[in-house]
From Swiss-Prot:
Composition skew (Basic residues), residue ranges: 118-137
Region (Disordered): 104-137
One GO MF term: structural constituent of ribosome
Coiled coil segments of this chain: none
The gene coding this protein: rpsI
GO cellular component, one term: cytosolic small ribosomal subunit
UniProt name for this protein: Small ribosomal subunit protein uS9
Keyword Ribosomal protein carried by entry: yes
Family listed: Belongs to the universal ribosomal protein uS9 family.
This protein's record includes keyword Ribonucleoprotein: yes
Family annotation (InterPro entries): Ribosomal_Su5_D2-typ_SF, Ribosomal_uS9, Ribosomal_uS9_bac/plastid, Ribosomal_uS9_CS, Ribsml_uS5_D2-typ_fold_subgr
Length: 137
């Protein structure tokens, strides 16, 4: 999560995680395009607008939605987990961009890592909490 110079352009890094998804996010000065694993964001997320809106939400909070391109390498989990991981990664990259961005992003909840994950299966049960059918006699 550091700023690096690439071809005379500043690149800001952020990593986000959600469930089993991990997203490594780069912010590059540009026009607001989202690229995930080499594909346009709307193609990767099957044109589900909520995912793209969520990804761009931290930028919109700061009024920077058309100033940075978002380049993402995401793996693990499903589309919802990856979209939330990207959102966290974008917010962390914006904190690298300027430390004063931290307070508005934190107050909106974009810097909070969602700790919920799948609960492990226990022996003697069918799933994490589903018990076999009880028979009184």
């Amino acid at each position: 999560m550091q700023a690096t110079e690439t071809k005379d352009r500043a690149v800001y890094w952020g990593t986000g995680r959600r469930k089993t998804s991990v997203a490594r996010v780069r912010l590059i000065p540009g026009t607001g395009q989202v690229t995930v694993n080499g594909k346009p964001g709307d193609t990767y997320f099957n044109r589900i607008a909520d995912y793209l809106q969520g990804i761009k939400a931290p930028l919109e909070t700061l009024g920077l939605e058309n100033e940075y391109d978002i380049l993402v390498k995401a793996h693990g989990g499903g589309l919802t987990g990856q979209a939330d991981a990207v959102k966290l990664g974008v917010a962390r990259a914006l904190c690298e961009l300027a430390p004063e961005n931290r307070q508005p992003l934190k107050s909106e909840g974009y810097l909070t890592r969602d700790p919920r994950a799948k609960e492990r299966k226990k022996y003697g049960l069918h799933k994490a909490r589903k018990a076999p059918q009880y028979s009184k006699r």
